Amino acid sequence: MNTPRVVVAGGGTAGHIEPALAVAESLRHRGAEVVALGTTKGLETSIVPERGFELRLINPVPVPRKINADLFKLPFRLLATISQTRKILKEFDTDVVIGFGGYVAAPAYIAAKLQKIPFIVHEANARSGMANKLGVRLGGMGLNAVANSGMPGTVVGIPIRSSLSGDNTALDRAQQLWGLDPEKKTILITGGSQGARSINAAVAEGIDAVLADPDVQVLHAYGRKNSAPEAQERYVPVAYIDDMAAAYAIADLVIGRSGAMTVAENTAAGIPAIYVPLPHGNGEQGLNAQPLVEEGAAVLVADSEFNGEAFSSLAAKILGDQETYNTMVIAAKESGTANAAETIADIIYSIVKNHDRNK
């Protein structure tokens, strides 16, 4: 079998990029050649090169939510982007395309279909998005993180970075990067790659009550476009966390949105969580977290109800009761699917092998 040449399409937010790169890393370890497809508008412009992968750019084609001039331009923009994507697939001599939803995925699926290149559609959320549903309808192989997403396909879980587990130096890095004490209980707060203003507001309101416990410290990723309270002893605000392995290594409790990638990484790390689902979209964030709540690994709080009092009281309840905490840790670890990236890499290699045989 020739060396597989794979294009991974996942851009915009970390929720689309991270699973794509987790699969890309697994493929690279096996000797495959991988190129990432993205746009100039997303986080991939920094994250992908930092991970050592080549990034090819196409024009983003967002779907307007209102009837306006942009809506009438949509077909022409989409055709132009599909043409760009087809050129990239041809130049790279692509064997397989795998998409993870978002603006980049739909042009990738359509271009792969037109080029007669096998393609895979991975849905990370509990409720599938439009681009991925389109991909499966076009003949792509559907892979789901969970059952009953609304998209046909095999359940494989969510691919996560191998560096998030088994990193013996991660705890030391957490101490060096943020001055955190590994002997204290650490709350990791994050609103995802974009931050979350409502969570930030609750932190500002409740941080003093949380820090009243001298055994608790807080690492707060508030988002590059947002602001946070001033740093103080045992409270470390940062705009963005580049080294999530270090953050997870020292964290005892995670508070944040319940995007599919966040939920997958938390459970793989075996960390109890308080999830505050994004109140917009099609409700997929609440659905992402619901199985963890039912299994006892997490608590779910509506965005409108998460304030300073909820922040401080829930954190104290979980971290202050060792039996409750231990039960949540066990439930989180049992819910994880840490081998999804390897499973998907196996599928890609099988497709390439069969495709070579049928040429």
Swiss-Prot record:
Catalytic class of the enzyme: transferase
Positions that bind UDP-N-acetyl-alpha-D-glucosamine: T13, A14, G15, N125, R161, S193, I241, Q285
A Gene Ontology cellular-component term: plasma membrane
Subcellular location(s) of the protein: Cell membrane
Domain of life (superkingdom): Bacteria
Membrane topology (UniProt): Peripheral membrane protein
GO terms for biological process, alphabetical: carbohydrate metabolic process; cell division; cell wall organization; lipid glycosylation; peptidoglycan biosynthetic process; regulation of cell shape
Entry GO MF terms: UDP-N-acetyl-D-glucosamine:N-acetylmuramoyl-L-alanyl-D-glutamyl-meso-2,6-diaminopimelyl-D-alanyl-D-alanine-diphosphoundecaprenol 4-beta-N-acetylglucosaminlytransferase activity; undecaprenyldiphospho-muramoylpentapeptide beta-N-acetylglucosaminyltransferase activity
Function description: Cell wall formation. Catalyzes the transfer of a GlcNAc subunit on undecaprenyl-pyrophosphoryl-MurNAc-pentapeptide (lipid intermediate I) to form undecaprenyl-pyrophosphoryl-MurNAc-(pentapeptide)GlcNAc (lipid intermediate II).
Protein name: UDP-N-acetylglucosamine--N-acetylmuramyl-(pentapeptide) pyrophosphoryl-undecaprenol N-acetylglucosamine transferase
Source taxonomy: Bacteria, Bacillati, Actinomycetota, Actinomycetes, Mycobacteriales
Gene: murG
